[in-house]
Amino acid sequence: MTLNSVAARTPDGRGLFDNLTLAFGRERTAVVGRNGVGKTTLLRLVAGLAEPAEGSVTRAGTVGWLAQAQTPTDDETVADTLGVAGPLAILHRVLAGEGSLDDMAEADWTLEERMQAALAEVGLADLALDRRTADLSGGEQTRLRLAGLKLAAPDLLVLDEPTNHLDAEAGAMIADVVAEWPGGVVLVSHDRALLRRVDRIVELSSLGARVHGGGWDLYVERRDAERAAAERDLEQAERAIGRVQRETQMAQERQARRDRAGKAARANSSDPKILLDAQAQRAEESGARGQRLAERKRQAVEADLTQARERVERVRQLALAMPATGLPAGRLVLNLNEAVVTVEDDRRLLGPISLRLTGPERVAVVGPNGAGKTTLLKLIAGLVEPSAGNVERPVRAALLDQQAAMLKPDETLVEAWLRLNPQGTPNAARAALARFLFRNVQADRRVGELSGGERLRAALACVMTGAQPPQLLVLDEPTNHLDIESIEAVEAALSGYDGALVVVSHDADFIQNLRVDRTIVLKSGQLQPSTTP
């Protein structure tokens, strides 16, 4: 698979990348970059699902595609999704003695065995083939499509965020499939555990693509070294511009003194006028040459400074500072006492659960999909009330989910801030949003226009910069739709948060980097015995 001088555009004509040349073989390649840079578009070009605006794509062999979000049709069955409905019907006709000669020739006698093996490998061993795909959870649908790819065995596997919405067990299964795939793999993911299993990383930006050999940890080591070098270059450039400015000022002062001295000497000299004029012209030309040299030097140093600032600003622009909450150590933040949550038909979703948190404790909640983690977070944040038991929450709490649902798509950021902080003023809203990097006209953007990372940043701004920042922050899969740079910025911001924290995330690196104090395990709505509340 080769991309030759490829360019890509958005539907409205905005350029994503130009003159991109890449080759993909049997190695495992991850594509990383900021949201909106064109990672999914690149994958679609590789998979043959899109055509480049310029350049060409050369393919040899078969390609399998696993999209980030695929909606099954209403009548689509498990067999349809696996891609075996037709071959399976042929096999069943032959086995029932109803097959034609063509059926006999086409029958795949190992199909059922291979199909069951593929389903078992992705944790769906007992799945009925006639079951509707739409009835499966999102994670189960991803597993099912992966089983279909294992059956098809393409030469090149193309995966777009394959671990999104999967629990830790399913994410580990995806990583194993990637590591063991006999052909080539090209993937986009913000799952750093998965990125550690690849052979190389392609860093995509508006400037093109840079290829880094090795997995995620080696890439980060090189990237951090480059960032440190950029900071050093900026410091040197700032010192150089200061030095040039001082030298220029001193040279101008010396020239001014020489000019004054020359004028005084000319006025008092008895030399012929033609000689004095020649001396004045030589002095003027010498001064002009010095000024031109100084100007060229100043321009060169300013160019170095601009370049150094741009390199550093790309990193610094995501830096966030969380305001202090003033939560005292040891203060009671939350006490759940035999709390139960049920739905209208009295079906129990959660509990009974007892859990006690004190400030500024950090707790991670883990468990399989469907265990009740989101319900528990809503109970902790006060968004649902217990059907039985008691909840004590003596501090202000706020819940941020992966969609930042507290924000309305049609409102501007200033409007959102004022709605969530009704005692504030428009000037206070703009100042607060600026702290979270929404400056000037950025504060007038509508929520619906924001990327996932921007939306989470806006939600943090609205929640954390009011008169009373929450002393208990509850996070439900906050990194699901973020690029890695945004995830790292959120990690850095939350590391400086001095309140209590409860987080659900399938991102083990995110949990580790938040330095949680303990992890509680939830399964079928119950805290597991290994949990110490």
Predicted feature locations:
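Coupling and communication elements adjacent to P-loop NTPase active sites across diverse families
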Residues: M1-T10, P87-T142, R222-V343
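Conserved beta-strand
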Residues: N4-V6, G15-E27, G55, L336-T342, ...
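ABC ATPase nucleotide-binding domain signature region
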Residues: G25-T29, T40-D102, R200-E203, G359-A371, ...
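ABC-family P-loop ATPase nucleotide-binding domains
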Residues: P72-G138, D401-L472, E477
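Conserved beta-strand-loop-alpha-helix hinge in the C-terminal portion
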Residues: D75-D80, L207-R232, L522-P533
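Hydrophobic anchor residue at the start of the ABC signature
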Residues: L146, I174, L460, T479
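Catalytic Walker B motif of ABC-type/P-loop ATPase nucleotide-binding domains
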Residues: L157-E161, L166, L400, L472-E477, ...
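Conserved D-loop/post-Walker B switch-helix segment of ABC ATPase nucleotide-binding domains
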Residues: A168-D176, N480-A492, D509
